[in-house]
Amino acid sequence: MATTKSSYRRIFGGNPRSSSSGNRYATSSTRYTLGSAMRPSTSSRMVYSTSSSPAVFKSSSVRLRSSLPPARMADSVDFALADAVNLEFKANRTNEKAEMIELNDRFANFIDKVRFLEQQNKILVAELEQLKGKGTSRIGDLYEEEMRELRRQLDQATNDKARVEVDRDNLADDLQRLREKLQDEMIQKEEAEGNLQSFRQDVDNASLARIDLERKVESLQEEIAFLKKLHDEEIRELQLQIQESHIQVDMDVSKPDLTAALRDVRQQYENVAAKNLSDAEEWYKSKFADLSEAANRNNDALRQAKQETSDFRRQIQTLTCEIDAMKGSNESYERQMREMEENFAIEAANYQDTIQRLQEEIQNMKEEMARHLREYQDLLNVKMALDIEIATYRKLLEGEESRISLPVHSFSTMSLRETNLDSHPAETHSKRTVLIKTVETRDGQVVNESSQHHDDFE
């Protein structure tokens, strides 16, 4: 930051002269003349120049010249001229005393103003140090803590979002797997319904076959009953015939071969009847066993088909319930995911607003710190100008004291030793003091400060 130019005239109402190279303060020369014998002259010049950092202040301060030209006086002292000189000297001394009082008052005012400005400078420096130290660190700590909290919440929200996305992907995979399983179950259901239809057809066919077999069994039972009845009638007829044959045998004893013949016939009929009865019973039993076995088979098939149908129905109901539950869970997860995305978007917007607000506060603090630094730099420049002005007035006071004491001494010498004034030439003293002050500033702060004094005598 370049050195800021300040004007002493704007603050204290002085009359500094400024040029393109910097600020220049010059004081006018004062010359007092004592007749033709004494011409003391005092001239002082203060030069203050500023440039870019590092700044160099060169002060060519007080150059005092006091000359006593050779006094040319007559052999006798002109007392009238001496009285005039005394009156003029008293008038000049009165004026100089008034000027010194005014300068002392102005110098006291300047000292008060310098003290006040030094106190204000200390207050501003303390505030600046406080802002640089505690304020900046506190705001920085708060900002860092807030940023860490926001980063932690952002990481947590990112992790939650990633976890929700993983859950969503897992649910999508589960839903896809359940859909595939549902398709398989639907295919199996269709196959089961086809099998059930075929089983129903088989059951119907088995029922028809069972009905046919039952009708056949009834017809066979009727036929067996008819045959049994016929057999009983034949047996009765044979018994009647046998009885009749016995009667005839009794009546006709003379026929010896009839009994044997009847016995043979009866034996033959009994054999035929027994054979027919056994054959009929065996055929009936075999047919009944076949029909019973077929009926049992059909009943087993029907029972198995009914059981499979009930199992398939239970599976269909279970899968339907699972599908409904999965649909509800999927809708719930999707709703939760939408809510979490909305909450995450709202929180992200709030975090962005908080970050923007903190950045604006940091920018405002930086601008305020820059303003304090500029004010501090202006006050520092004013302080330097006041230091230079005080040094100038100090040199002027020293020059005035030397100028006031020098004519009195010369006048007493002239009055008492007039012979020596003719024989000794006046001595001319010239003292030149050069003060070189180097102040290096960086970013509005004094980094290095050094001063050098050089005294030259002429």
UniProtKB/Swiss-Prot annotation:
Chain residue ranges for the region called Head: 1-88
UniProt GO molecular function: structural constituent of cytoskeleton
Region (Disordered): 1-27
Stored InterPro entries: IF_conserved, IF_rod_dom, Intermed_filament_DNA-bd, Intermediate_filament
Site entry: Stutter: F344
Region described as Linker 12: spans on this chain: 239-261
Keyword Disulfide bond found: no
Gene Ontology cellular component list: axon; cytoplasm; intermediate filament; plasma membrane
Chain residue ranges for the region called Tail: 401-458
Coiled coil: none
Positions of region (Linker 1): 125-146
Keyword Coiled coil set for record: yes
Pfam families to which the protein is assigned, alphabetical: Filament, Filament_head
Entry comment on modification after translation: One of the most prominent phosphoproteins in various cells of mesenchymal origin. Phosphorylation is enhanced during cell division, at which time vimentin filaments are significantly reorganized.
Keywords carried by this UniProt record: Coiled coil, Intermediate filament
Domain IF rod: 96-404
Region (Coil 1B), start-end ranges: 147-238
Region annotation Coil 2: where it falls in the sequence: 262-400
Example GO biological process: intermediate filament organization
Similarity field: Belongs to the intermediate filament family.
Complexes and interactors: Homomer.
Protein's UniProt name: Vimentin-1/2
Species of the source: Xenopus laevis (African clawed frog)
Name of the gene encoding the protein in the UniProt record: vim1
